[in-house]
From Swiss-Prot:
Residues 231-247, 276-290 have a biased composition (Low complexity). It comes from Homo sapiens. The keyword Lipoprotein applies. This is Phosphatase and actin regulator 2. Keywords: Actin-binding, Lipoprotein, Membrane, Myristate, Phosphoprotein, Protein phosphatase inhibitor, Repeat. Residues 153-162, 324-341 have a biased composition (Pro residues). Binds PPP1CA and actin. GO terms for cellular component: plasma membrane; platelet alpha granule membrane. Residues 13-26 have a biased composition (Polar residues). Residues 108-120, 137-147, 291-304, 488-508 have a biased composition (Basic and acidic residues).
């Protein structure tokens, strides 16, 4: 059967337009035709470049590192990375969990399709239904499950696998290209489901199909889990086997929800019965894209929808009493195999040993109250559980299992027998399982990874998962590590690198240095000695002043003895002309004359012609050298 599933996976991945789930590199863009045409006209690019060995080795190392890179969810689960707060408004690309790994929704849908196809042979998974048909199915499952005892965690009566009915042409097994490719490639486009979900007053048209049974169970489990974390005590009261207890439980959940809605503005208020029931039915089919974080656009629309109802708390409690039956407008449901109960589907979703919880009287997913399913969209289901070791668990697994501490805090619930004691082992087992799975399952588009793999994969295998990764991230800060690794003075003294010295020894060393310096300074010659050696001149201010005065007198005497101009003329040393000759000259351009710049092509041709004529007729040339005469071109 595994081989068949593998074959289906490969076939569907090959046919789907989205990026392949197992690919290690993101899909690269095709080069346009222009670049190849351009190379034809560039002959210097024709020769094939030889790839260097270094380049090949580096690329091989990089591919190996990328193949062993762990997903962000894996690192959060191991406690290496802290989980960043979800940015509600900024999320443009919806990611979905598949067994602890983040992949785009387009990939997940193809993967879920394959699982549905392969498991249909076993009759274990029900096929996809539009949301209105699921509501009609809810009605049937309600009546079936009320007759059973609440304490029995057994399967509902499983029908034999029936042939898949002919769907409409839109609902092909692979979702339409717009749905998958749009979700995976264009992050800014919202899938059509989400627009239908918030349509204010009308019943929306049937949306294109999403991955069916596993996603609905995840949402149902997520809704029950989110109710636990919001702290509404009344919703968790154990339900009795009688049919009348169901509406009562739903009223309590509704009233507790109305209380929390009144206190916090961010919570949704449901206004009228068709809208609430329609929202709940859409919630069950809209896949995990709503669980992982809605775009800001849909949040705003839902918030406007809340504000249309004044005094919603009083109206809600009255209207929710009549809200339990689903809307009567529904086409006849196609024959379906009943879905697996919550435990079995959780096991198929996360193939790890887990502690399983079923809310109330272990009802299958389709039998859950629509008002409970409505809260699957609540952002409060983004809670993360912590195991005994303090590691955060990814959201998908958090919907399927819980820890001993939380079981003690919450109201009494039914556990699958024999698994309570294994909760601590199941966490460590799931960690090891995830560590093994990430190499095969991981894709390169799994959101931001906050570190880069600097070391070889061997180091990853050496240490245990958490410590090796933590040390790898710490190793990035090399300076801090080097400073932290510097040995202390005591260690250096212990290793005999530094000599151990007491305070007295240090004082003695200082005194020795001081005496050396004093001795050297005392050996310097004094100023008197230098003056005696005539190195330093004696300074006497009176003598200096006298020398200056003498210099001035000598200079002034020289200046006073200078002859006047008349004396110089008399001695005929200076001769002045009586007049100055002045000649007029025209102003002209002193740059060199360039006649060739003024010649036109016709002038040049005439000059060449004249030269040729002169050389051929008039110029005297020796007969033997006439052949060497150079003529200008005409």
């Amino acid at each position: 059967m595994d081989n068949a599933v593998d074959g289906l996976d490969k076939a569907s991945i090959a046919n789907s337009d989205g990026p392949t789930a197992g690919s290690q590199t993101p899909p690269f863009k095709r080069k346009g035709k222009l670049s190849t045409i351009g190379k034809i006209f560039k002959p210097w690019k024709w020769r094939k470049k030889k790839t260097s060995d270094k380049f090949r080795e580096t690329s091989a190392v990089l591919e190996r590192k990328i193949s062993t890179r762990q997903s962000r969810e894996e690192l959060i689960r191991r406690g290496v990375l802290k989980e960043l707060p979800d940015q509600d408004g900024d999320v443009t690309v919806n990611f979905e969990n598949s067994n602890g790994h983040m992949i785009p929704i387009g990939e997940e849908s193809t993967r879920e399709e394959n699982v549905v196809k392969s498991e249909e042979g076993n009759g274990s998974v029900s096929e996809k239904t539009p949301p209105l048909e699921e509501q009609a199915e809810d009605k049937k499952e309600n009546t079936e499950n009320h007759s059973e005892t609440p304490a029995a965690p057994a399967l509902p009566p499983s029908a034999p696998p029936k042939p898949r009915p002919k769907p409409k042409p839109k609902k092909s097994p692979v979702p339409p290209k717009g749905a998958t490719a749009g979700a995976s490639h264009k992050g800014d486009e919202v899938p059509p489901i989400k627009k239908n979900t918030k349509a204010p007053g009308k019943q929306a048209p049937v949306p294109p199909p999403k991955p069916a049974s596993r996603n609905t169970t995840r949402e149902a489990a997520g809704s029950s889990h989110s109710k636990k974390t919001t702290g509404s005590k009344a919703s968790a009261s154990p339900s009795t086997s009688s049919t009348s207890s169901r509406p009562k439980a739903s009223k309590e959940t509704v009233s507790s929800k109305a209380g929390t809605v009144g206190t916090t503005k961010g919570k949704r208020k449901t206004d009228k019965q068709p809208i609430t029931s329609h929202l709940s039915s859409d919630t069950t089919t809209s896949g995990t894209s709503d669980l992982k974080g809605e775009p800001a656009e849909t949040r705003v629309e839902s918030f406007k929808l809340e504000q249309t109802v004044p005094g919603a708390e009083e109206q809600n409690t009255g209207k929710f009493k009549s809200m339990v039956p689903p809307p009567p407008v529904a086409p006849a449901p196609s024959p379906l195999a009943p879905p697996l109960p919550l435990e079995d589907q959780c096991i198929t979703a996360s193939d790890t040993p887990v502690v399983l919880v079923s809310v109330g009287a272990d009802l299958p997913v389709s039998a859950l109250d629509p008002s409970q399913l409505l809260w699957a969209e609540e952002p409060t289901n983004r809670t993360t559980l912590y195991s005994g070791t303090g590691l955060s668990v990814n959201r998908e697994n958090a919907k399927c299992f819980t820890t001993k501490e939380e079981l003690g805090k919450t109201v009494p619930q039914l556990l699958t027998p024999g698994l309570m004691g294994e909760s601590s082992e199941s966490f460590s087992a799931s960690e090891d399982e995830g560590h093994r799975e990430y190499q095969a399952n991981d894709s390169d588009s799994d959101g931001p990874i906050l570190y880069t793999d600097d070391e070889d994969e061997d180091e990853d295998e050496d240490g245990s998962g958490e410590s090796a990764l933590a040390s790898k991230i710490r190793r990035r800060d090399t300076l801090a590590i080097k400073l932290g690794n510097r040995p202390s003075k005591k260690e250096l003294e212990d290793k005999n690198i530094l000599q151990r010295t007491s305070e007295e020894e240090r004082q003695e060393i200082r005194q020795q240095i001081g005496t050396k310096l004093v001795r050297r300074l005392s050996q310097r010659p004094t100023t008197e000695e230098l003056e005696q050696r005539n190195i330093l001149k004696q300074k006497n201010e009176e003598e200096e002043q006298e020398a200056k005065m003498e210099l001035k007198r000598r200079l002034s005497r020289k200046l006073s003895l200078r002859p006047t101009v008349a004396e110089l003329q008399a001695r005929r040393i200076l001769r002045f002309n009586e007049y100055v000759e002045v000649t007029d000259s025209p102003d002209y351009d002193r740059r060199a004359d360039k006649p060739w710049a003024r010649l036109t092509p016709a002038d040049k041709a005439a000059i060449r012609k004249e030269l040729n004529e002169f050389k051929s007729t008039e110029m005297e040339v020796h007969e033997e050298s006439r052949q060497f005469t150079r003529f200008h071109r005409p």
